[in-house]
């Protein structure tokens, strides 16, 4: 049972994105699959049941729950994805990292085979007819609908295929094979985006981690020269179709964010403390909708309930405004004390109506 629940109904989400005075701040509380092996399941379910604003569709399951994990999040079971990258993880539910890069030897590029975007999402098979039917079903229910590129669609995918250091050196050296690889990745991504648009989704989400704890994973100059043009090509059909564009990156992206959002990004999803709450507020408040990722490194795992409450309020006061432009999301992972989990759920519920 993996829970990723948003408290935002369709109209409230649209009002928040468009700065049209939403009735409340949309809140999403995501519980990572690993949590169900880490915490007492009933204790976690009790917290969910006690917070219906965050979990409006909650139905208590029988325990112990039968758990299933994504193919690249299974402990000690290496997984080879459709690009030939081999993933490994040490904990069930935690997405692993790529340990084997199919083009560690670039001399093999001529024989390297790409997955077919008509059949693959990159991390597994896709049935586009079933996708269209599911989008239609959700629309009929009045729900917001999404088309999600796989996480790490371009730069991270290049690093997974080639290896991080080799990828950066290849870009610096303008290696023709790697430039061609990026072009093929862009075409693969565009094929999937076109399927999202054919299905008439409301929001296209384009997630890729570009930041480290301090600074970006790629220099701003290399990003502007090689990655940004591909981003712009992927955004163009979405903009033309009038769809909402949601961009995500973890890490410190302050030196990249102007280039990331240039050209019509409607929502930027970034992390609070690593970028600085004050900086985020100065940069985006009242201008671009922020889907703010609440701290998972410092305050929620190691702070007090009072500090958690104060942090959520500070984020809302600094980044939000009465007109909207703010959503908040938290990802729960093993290690956060249950009293802090409760404190965060309480704060997200309490302050959602801060401007009303």
Annotate each predicted stretch with a short phrase.
Residues 34-72:
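Segments that shape or occlude catalytic/ligand-binding pockets
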Residues 70-120, 140-144:
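A contiguous, low-structure linker/loop signature
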Residues 27, 53-58, 80-85:
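Secondary-structure transition motif
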Residues 1-41, 80, 89, 114-356:
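Active-site loop segments of alpha/beta catalytic cores
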């Amino acid at each position: 049972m993996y829970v990723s629940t948003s408290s935002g109904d369709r109209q409230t989400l649209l009002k928040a994105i468009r700065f049209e005075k939403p009735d409340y701040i949309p809140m999403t509380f995501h519980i990572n699959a690993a949590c169900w092996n880490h915490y007492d399941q009933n204790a976690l379910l009790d917290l969910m049941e006690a917070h219906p604003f965050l979990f409006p569709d909650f139905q208590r399951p029988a325990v112990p729950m039968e758990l299933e994990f994504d193919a690249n999040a299974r402990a000690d079971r290496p997984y080879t994805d459709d690009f030939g990258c081999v993933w490994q993880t040490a904990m069930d539910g935690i997405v692993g990292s790529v340990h084997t890069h199919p083009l560690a030897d670039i001399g093999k590029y001529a024989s390297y085979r790409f997955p077919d975007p008509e059949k693959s999402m990159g991390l597994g098979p896709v049935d586009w007819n079933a996708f269209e039917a599911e989008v239609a079903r959700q629309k009929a229910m009045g729900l917001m609908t999404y088309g999600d590129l796989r996480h790490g669609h371009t730069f991270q995918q290049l690093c997974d295929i080639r290896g991080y250091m080799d990828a950066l050196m290849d870009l610096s050296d303008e290696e023709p094979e790697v430039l061609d690889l990026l072009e093929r990745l862009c075409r693969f991504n565009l094929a999937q985006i076109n399927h999202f648009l054919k299905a008439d989704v409301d929001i296209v989400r384009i997630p890729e981690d570009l930041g480290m704890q301090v600074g970006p994973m790629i220099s701003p100059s290399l990003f502007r020269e090689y990655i940004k043009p591909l981003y712009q090509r992927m955004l163009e059909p979405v903009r033309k179709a009038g769809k909402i564009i949601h961009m995500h990156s973890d890490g410190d992206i302050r030196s990249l964010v102007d280039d990331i959002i240039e050209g019509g990004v409607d929502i930027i999803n970034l992390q609070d403390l690593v970028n600085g709450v004050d900086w985020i507020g100065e940069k985006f408040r009242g201008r671009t909708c922020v889907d703010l990722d609440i701290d998972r490194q410092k305050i929620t795992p190691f702070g007090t309930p009072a500090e958690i409450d104060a942090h959520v309020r500070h984020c809302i006061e600094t980044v939000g405004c009465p007109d909207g432009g703010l959503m908040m999301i938290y990802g729960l992972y093993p290690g956060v004390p249950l009293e802090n989990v409760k404190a965060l759920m309480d704060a997200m519920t309490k302050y959602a109506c801060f401007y009303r």
